[in-house]
Design a protein with these regions (language model features):
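Extreme N-terminal basic, low-complexity initiation segments
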Residues: 2-7
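Class I S-adenosyl-L-methionine
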Residues: 8-10, 14-236
């Protein structure tokens, strides 16, 4: 069957008679990427099924392990109020995205990513990671840790919490990454202002939000590799 990875000699000979090359086998999905952009870093990867906003990741019901990036705006420091804007929302009002992502990781295995200090951890009874390394997060077989995305190519340090279940837990680069400051802004305004401004805000310009929110490809590959160990455990 073409597209299933199961193509016998007769099928291959059929294409030869037509003077055409047989299409390459399509790798069946082994991981689902939830709450990601349709044209983002997870798009068109072999064995990865993308669930974006249009597809509504909340509808995912398995069976593959997941990499989940549920929206974080309603769980952060400014979930309800921003000093420059005023009232902006209600804490936890994310239309059930985090709850579904947590359920999917616990049910099918995989890993979930959220910013450090995400209030979703306390909301859902997860123990926050306090030191380097994986730690037990709950009574459902989940583990959590803190990493910094600068170790994987992000422009900023971007400390991040991970939650994983039913997968192998790799040793990762723990601890703080090297601080990066915009050299021109640092020279003009001094360390404290440059630190508060951040490298992404100064270097990113109009693209600063996109750059800040982007998942570096090395981190994407790491998260997929973690999730795939869940698929191996399921097959064992």
């Amino acid at each position: 069957l073409v597209g299933s990875g199961l193509m016998d000699a007769g099928t291959a000979n059929f294409f030869e008679l037509l003077g055409a090359s047989a299409p390459a086998p399509v790798e069946p999905p082994s991981v689902a990427a939830l709450y990601v952009e349709a044209d983002g870093v997870y798009a068109n990867l072999p064995g990865v099924e993308v669930y974006d906003r249009q597809r509504d990741a909340r509808r995912y019901r398995g069976p593959h392990p997941v990499v989940a990036h549920p929206p974080c705006s309603r769980w952060g420091r400014y979930a309800e109020y921003h000093p420059m804007v005023g009232d902006i929302g209600v804490l936890g009002d994310d239309d059930g995205c985090f709850a579904h992502a947590l359920w999917a990781v616990r049910s099918f295995g995989g890993v979930l990513e959220h910013p450090k200090e995400s209030q979703a951890w306390a909301w859902f009874g997860l123990m926050p990671p306090l030191t380097g390394g994986w730690q037990r997060a709950d009574d459902f077989g989940g583990y959590t840790c803190c990493i910094e995305q600068c170790h994987y190519g992000h422009a900023a340090r971007k400390p991040t919490w991970l939650y994983a279940a039913k997968v192998e837990l790799p040793s990762l680069p723990w601890g703080r990454g090297k601080q990066r400051l915009h050299e021109g802004y640092l020279a003009k305004h001094g360390y404290e202002k440059a630190r508060r401004a951040g490298i992404v805000a100064m270097a990113g310009g109009k693209d600063k939000v996109r750059i800040r929110e982007a998942t570096p490809e090395p981190l994407r590959d790491l998260l997929i590799s973690i999730a795939r160990t869940g698929a191996r455990e399921e097959a064992a």
